[in-house]
Amino acid sequence: MDFDSYADNYSKSISKKQCLELFEDNENLFNILNCANKINKKINGNTITYVVNRNINFTNICVGDCKFCAFKVDENHNDAYFINPKEIGKKAFEAKKLGCTEVCIQGGLRNNIDVELQSNILKEVCSATKPLGGIHIHAFSPMEVKFASENSGLDIKEALMILKENGLNTMPGTAAEILDDNIRAELCPSKLSTKEWIKIVKTAHKVGIKTTSTMMYGHIEEYKHIVNHLFILKEIQEETGGITEFVPLSFMHKMAPIYYEGNARGGSSGIEDLKVYAISRMLFGDTIKNIQVSWVKLGIKLAQMGLKCGANDFGGTLMEENISKSAGASYGTYMGAEEIRNVINAIGGAPRERDTFYNILE
């Protein structure tokens, strides 16, 4: 590949075959990373964004069987917890007082969770934060929506419409892991299928709920699975335009059952992490304009590298992020806005606070 020429004409995009070849190409690593950085500069300039937000993982009780998850516990476990809607509202109020523009609300699949309970959570957050001007609610993965809708006897569109009416603004595109049913059969057997994930995300877009998109890699997948996953996301975005960002998530292996049982590798290498950012940018161009580094999973220094290899967003302040922590992430769960700005300035970027839709707030 002529990398300089491609950086100038990235709108032509690359084929699946070329994409796979880039992942397998170790000789041209720095050309790949540099090409992605050039494309990102053309699209986003020197701006590196971040969001002031709070994660609220409202329960770790889950009937799921995801083999990568160290967060879930059974109902009667000593460490089991469930934060009721009123308390979630209080947490959202605290977040708003501290300057957050977004709360991200997700939890395990507890048997009592239905659309009514999810709606009550949304209503409590809206009510609690209304005196302060409200807060953006980014909540409930496609799997959570599927689970709650089935418990309520509703179809997906009906469930999403009810959630939207009660205050849901956007939805995390999590529960994607790797969008390949053979991989999912080993990794998360009872989780929604690739087809179901796509349907729920597209339906959300069609009813006016934008989503993020994610990919968890570094476990049992091969490069071909990553490539297919990226193309699925690209095709969704070309059809709906409803994806706000792409967030690659490096597998946290230390406490993951599938790893300590000897059935998965110990996460990705730093080189693989940078390749994922770079090749995603080369493929997506400005179709999915925003690519986020996960500082909780990568650590600060590798996250900074990712921002020079095609990514343009540092993510959020988070305040609490229990899922990565449970799986063995050791880079903290909170970073203040000033510290984030310093991290971005240190690599010559221009830090800008954004909202969930990537509108600049300063």
From Swiss-Prot:
CDD domains: Radical_SAM (cd01335). Its cofactor is [4Fe-4S] cluster. Pfam families: CofH_C (PF19288), Radical_SAM (PF04055). [4Fe-4S] cluster binds at C62, C66, C69. Binds 1 [4Fe-4S] cluster. The cluster is coordinated with 3 cysteines and an exchangeable S-adenosyl-L-methionine. It catalyses: 5-amino-6-(D-ribitylamino)uracil + L-tyrosine + S-adenosyl-L-methionine = 5-amino-5-(4-hydroxybenzyl)-6-(D-ribitylimino)-5,6-dihydrouracil + 2-iminoacetate + 5'-deoxyadenosine + L-methionine + H(+). Pathway: Cofactor biosynthesis; coenzyme F0 biosynthesis. Residues 48-294 form the Radical SAM core domain. It comes from the Archaea. Its EC number is 2.5.1.147. It is an enzyme of class 2 (transferase). Gene3D superfamilies: Aldolase class I. GO terms for molecular function: 4 iron, 4 sulfur cluster binding; 5-amino-6-(D-ribitylamino)uracil--L-tyrosine 4-hydroxyphenyl transferase activity; 7,8-didemethyl-8-hydroxy-5-deazariboflavin synthase activity; iron ion binding. Keywords: 4Fe-4S, Iron, Iron-sulfur, Metal-binding, S-adenosyl-L-methionine, Transferase. Consists of two subunits, CofG and CofH. PANTHER family: FO SYNTHASE (COFH), LIPOYL SYNTHASE 2. Catalyzes the radical-mediated synthesis of 5-amino-5-(4-hydroxybenzyl)-6-(D-ribitylimino)-5,6-dihydrouracil from 5-amino-6-(D-ribitylamino)uracil and L-tyrosine. Belongs to the radical SAM superfamily. CofH family. This is 5-amino-6-(D-ribitylamino)uracil--L-tyrosine 4-hydroxyphenyl transferase. It comes from Methanococcus aeolicus (strain ATCC BAA-1280 / DSM 17508 / OCM 812 / Nankai-3). The gene is cofH.
